[in-house]
Structures are given as C-alpha cells and as structure tokens.
A protein has these predicted regions:
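Hydrophobic pocket/interface hotspot
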Residues: 49-50, 59, 74, 88, ...
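Glycine-rich portal/gate segments that line the openings of hydrophobic small-molecule binding cavities
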Residues: 54, 60-105, 109
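Hydrophobic ligand-binding cavity/cleft-lining segments
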Residues: 6-9, 14-67
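Beta-strand/loop substructures that line and gate deep hydrophobic ligand-binding cavities in soluble
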Residues: 98-152, 156
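A generic structural signal for beta-strand entry/edge sites
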Residues: 33, 73, 94-96, 120-124
C-alpha cells in the first residue's frame, strides 16, 4: 500500500512537471516571436482588394493553391502535401481579416487590413504577422512573394 501511494505521488509530480514544461515551452515560443508590420500599396478599390483577402475563393489564386472554408476555419493547401489550418478570429467586412494558425500560440496571428491614404489616393494592404527572431527577413520575403502573386492575379 505504501509503495502504491508513493507511486501515485510520483505520478502526480510527473504530471505537474509535464504541465510546467508545456507552459514554459508556450511562454518561450511566444517570447521568441516578434511582430512584423508591412505595407503594400495596391492599385485597386477597397471592394476589389476585399474580394481577394476576405473570401476563400479570393485567397486561393494568390495566397495558397487551394483554400477551403467551413464556418470560421480555413484550410490552406500548397502543392500536394503542405496543409495548414487557420481560424478566423476577427473580421470587419471590407476592412480586415485576422487569422490564427491552429498550430501557433494564441497570442500570434496574421492580419490583412485595407487602408486608404488621402494624399496618394491609394489603398494599402497592411500586413501584421509574427516570426521567430532569426526568420523575420524570410517571413517578409514570403509576404513580398505572396503580394506579388496577388498583384499578378488581380492586376492591382
């Protein structure tokens, strides 16, 4: 009986340790990511830009090879094997969409927001994203490539 009691205490402590390790991992992953903000001027109306960022049909020609949407869950496919799931966490029609990758921390997201500059009379697509400290330039390059795809697909 004493051995069984000691084993149960050890098992509880192991679970506590396991939970503690998971919490530390989450905190470290949050701390290691930095916010990225990029602006891209686009030659198109807000409604045209919105069609490309606010719907799965609009996202599929430029952001991913295929995009499926069920309720607030978007599944993005690249090539034959890469797939990622994101949840739509906020949206204001005609203004912005904000997604959180399913496999990322709750505090990270990526957002696409449409703004208008009165001086230049151009719309801008503002991107907010998060990346590991050593991968910031790679992430920016990826967004540059994605926006170039958007411009080619849409004529913006």
């Amino acid at each position: 009986m004493l051995v069984l009691l000691n084993f149960n205490i050890l098992r509880l402590r192991y679970k506590e340790l396991d939970t503690t390790i998971q919490v530390i991992y989450i905190i470290l992953s949050i701390m290691s990511k930095e916010k990225i903000y990029i602006e891209y001027p686009l030659k198109g109306s807000a409604s045209m830009i919105w069609r490309y960022i606010g719907t799965s049909a609009g996202l599929s020609p430029w952001f991913a090879d295929r995009v499926e949407n069920i309720d607030r869950t978007f599944t993005f496919y690249w090539g034959k094997s890469e797939k990622r799931v994101a949840h739509l966490v906020a949206q204001r029609n005609g203004v912005y969409v904000k997604f959180r990758w399913e496999d990322e921390s709750q505090s990270t997201y990526f957002e696409m927001r449409i703004s208008y500059n009165e001086l230049t009379r151009e719309h801008t697509l503002e991107i907010t994203d998060f990346a590991e400290k050593g991968e910031i330039e790679d992430q920016k390059d990826l967004w540059d490539s994605q926006i170039e795809n958007l411009r080619r697909q849409s004529g913006m």
